[in-house]
Structure formats: C-alpha cells, structure tokens
Amino acid sequence: MNKANPKNIPPLAPKKVFIKTYGCQMNVYDSQRMTDSLSSKGYVATQTPNDADLILVNTCHIREKAAEKLYSDLGRLRVMRQERTPDKPLMVGVTGCVAQAEGSEILRRAPIVDLVIGPQMYHRLPDLLEQTKQGKKIVATEYAVEDKFAHLPPHNKRAVRKRGVSAFLTVQEGCDKFCTFCVVPYTRGAEISRSVEQITEEARQLIEAGVKEITLLGQNVNGWHGQNVNGKTWRLGDLLYHLAKLDGLKRLRYTTSHPRDMDDSLIAAHRDLDILMPYLHLPVQSGSDRILKAMNRQHKSIHYLQLIEKIRNARPDIAFSGDFIVGFPGETDEDFEETIKLIKQVEYSSAYSFKYSPRPGTVGATMKNHVEEAVKDARLQHLQVLLLEQQNAFLRSKIGQTTDVLIEKAGRHSGQMVGRSPWLLPVVVDTQASTGTVIPIHIKNTSSNSFVGEMTNM
C-alpha cells in the first residue's frame, strides 16, 4: 500500500475569531491585542460572526443597561450556536468591564458562555481557551500578579496594516480618583503605568508596521509616570518628548485626561511639539462647584477654566472636547446653569454628554435627591443643542484655512479619500494621495461632523 504523501495533505483552515467591542478606545486596543495573542493558537480575525469559531464580547460598564445589552447579545449567540452543525462548533467568551463586574453571574444567566475574562487577564486568554476545550467553564476576573503587557506577543504586522495608519497604544490603566459616578476603579483597578521601555518598543513595532499616528491611551492618561534609562522620574509630557523623536512617526495624541494631572511639562509639550496634535479631550462633567465636590472631582470650575486658558496660551490653535453628566443627584436648575455658563466660556469643538445613571457599587448610587428623568431629559436636550451649535461654529471657523491632513482610507466614491485633521475630525477630499501621507488640504466646506477639502497648489 502506498504511503500517503504529506505534501498532498491540505493545510488546516485557520480558526476564526470575531470580537464585538463596546465602549472606549482602550476596549478597541484590548480587542486588537486579544486578537494578536490568539494568533499563537492559529486564530485569525473575521469581520462576520457567522463564520467564527470563537466569539468574544468585549464589554463596557460605564453606561446604564450595559449588562442588559450583553445578555441580549448572548441570547442571539445562543440561537446561533443551536443552528451550528456538529462540525462547526462555536465557543463564546465575555471580556471587559461587565465581565469584571458580573463574574460568575454571567455563567449563571447565560450557560452558553464558555469563559469570562476581566480586563487584567486577557494576556492569559490563549491558555484559558485550552482549558475550556476540556469542558471547563472559566471565570478569570482576579487582578493578575504579573504584568499583563509584558506577556503579550509582539504586534502582528499584517493585522496592524489592515487596521490602518492610526493606532492606539495603552500607556496607563486604572484609576485612583474614585469619582462618585464612575465604576472604572472597580473594574479596571488601581492606576498602573507601563514602563518607558515597553511603550517605546510597542511604538516602534507599530511604526514598523506602517502606523503614522499613535494615540496614547489611559483611563487617566496624564497620570502616567515612569523612569528613563538614567532613573529620572518622567511624567506624560516627558514621554511625549521622547516618542516624538521616533523615526517614521508623524503624529501623536493622548486621551483621556484628568484636569488635576495637567502639569506644566505636559502643557509645554503642546507648545513645543508640532507632532503633538492640537486637540485635547479634557472632561469636566459639571460647571457647578457644588456638584463637582459631590462627584469628588477634586477641583473647582475656576481651576478648570484657568487650565483651559493656560493651554490655549501655549497652543492657540488647540481644540477642546469634553464630557458632561446632567442630572447628578442633587443637581438643581442653578447647578445646571453653571454648566451651561462654563460651556459657553470654553467653546468646545465637540463633547460627549449623558444623563446620570447610578452604577452599582459607586458612592453615587447610594446618594439621595435623585433628579427626575423628565428633568434629566430636558437638561440633556438643552445642553446638546448648545454643544451642537459650538461644534458647527468650530467647523465653520476652519473654512478657508489650509491644514495638514493624514490620509487614512478610501472614501465612498471613486477618487475620494478620507483623512484626519489635526483636530481629530475627518476630512473628505478628492485626491490620489496614498494612505499614510500627510498633505496640505484647503478646507472649502463642512458636512456632518466633518470637513470637505480640496487639494492645494503646492
């Protein structure tokens, strides 16, 4: 009998993973890094859940009904699994902040789930998956002793190239501020800062894969601190000066910041570094000192306004975005008017605004004098009308200007490309320029939350 020729055996098809990501930019980063770590087990990313062998739901716990949204997704996945044939099994995992908060309750309510992994454990995902293949149900929500970032594999260059020329890089995680409305200290843990060496190496990997713009991430990113090779303590401003020297990198950003940690070295970086884009997301949440105190924000509105002025003096072309919560317990009409007053003074380019919703486990959830939903709705509508007016005014203010735009991807129409302005907003332009190039574009009009540009005569 002839022996089979191994060369004629078709290679095994790669396993596919689909990750549904909710929430912040850090969750996007986490999903990308989970995909990279799973490549060691033969997984490749897919954009459609129907052909996936593994589906992960990477969750966010910031807003109300986050858990309910998860269980709705899991209900649909239960039907999908039932429809699978025996030769196409489906594994289901839940990751992220709802996983951290709910833990084993997820397995109780949704037996379809094979594993539950908190944000500090996703570096163990490949090994935990192997355990589920033995029929085990896994709940891994403890805070790992080891540095999870040190155990992640290098970036997959092919995957990075597919994602585009802009990338996220987590430099700090967790929060020690304990704002009374926020679950982050409970789901992400205490503040940790990655080392300068780790950050530099990951930035180099991204640049080698074609990335031109890096956004440094952290729940409290300007709380980052580390040591340089000489043992000197660095803050975020020092790190930005350091990364700005990397060959091939064209742009830097960072988010999200706390007003308390905006120090002089960071403001100086905005003044000195052209590579640092003139855009800053600086949440304030309320303009009322009484509400800021109740939120444990640890600053007053005047301090925030003075900080805005100081940063604008350092970088006159900077655009600010913010976060606002209306209807925090005890908020009066007068408190809300203080918020409106602050918004008018700052003049934001964009902002995120929400109705307060009590998050289990936070101090805010135990407070009295909750605001009626109808009042919250009215205040939110009022606030959003003002913010939209400011956003449109900012867009119009750039008409007629020429600005450098990073070309990111093809547009909807033939010959059209979409780029990123220095102020983060997209720019649509007819051009043959390649992705990754930075070119001067004349802003001739605006669209919904974006600019319409044209090539200049260089």
Swiss-Prot record:
It is an enzyme of class 2 (transferase). Its EC number is 2.8.4.3. Residues 15-134 form the MTTase N-terminal domain. InterPro entries: Elp3/MiaA/NifB-like_rSAM, Methylthiotransferase, Methylthiotransferase_CS, Methylthiotransferase_N, Methylthiotransferase_N_sf, MiaB_methiolase, rSAM, rSAM_horseshoe. Its cofactor is [4Fe-4S] cluster. [4Fe-4S] cluster 1 binds at C24, C60, C97. Its main location: cytoplasm. Keywords: 4Fe-4S, Cytoplasm, Iron, Iron-sulfur, Metal-binding, S-adenosyl-L-methionine, Transferase, tRNA processing. One of its GO terms (molecular function) is metal ion binding. The keyword DNA repair does not apply. It is found in: Cytoplasm. It comes from the Bacteria. Binds 2 [4Fe-4S] clusters. One cluster is coordinated with 3 cysteines and an exchangeable S-adenosyl-L-methionine. Residues 396-457 form the TRAM domain. Gene3D superfamilies: Methylthiotransferase, N-terminal domain (3.40.50.12160), tm_1862 like domain (3.80.30.20). It catalyses: N(6)-dimethylallyladenosine(37) in tRNA + (sulfur carrier)-SH + AH2 + 2 S-adenosyl-L-methionine = 2-methylsulfanyl-N(6)-dimethylallyladenosine(37) in tRNA + (sulfur carrier)-H + 5'-deoxyadenosine + L-methionine + A + S-adenosyl-L-homocysteine + 2 H(+). The keyword 4Fe-4S applies. GO terms for cellular component: cytosol. SUPFAM superfamilies: Radical SAM enzymes (SSF102114). [4Fe-4S] cluster 2 binds at C175, C179, C182. Catalyzes the methylthiolation of N6-(dimethylallyl)adenosine (i(6)A), leading to the formation of 2-methylthio-N6-(dimethylallyl)adenosine (ms(2)i(6)A) at position 37 in tRNAs that read codons beginning with uridine. Belongs to the methylthiotransferase family. MiaB subfamily. Monomer. This is tRNA-2-methylthio-N(6)-dimethylallyladenosine synthase. It comes from Bartonella henselae (strain ATCC 49882 / DSM 28221 / CCUG 30454 / Houston 1). The lineage of its organism: Bacteria, Pseudomonadati, Pseudomonadota, Alphaproteobacteria, Hyphomicrobiales.
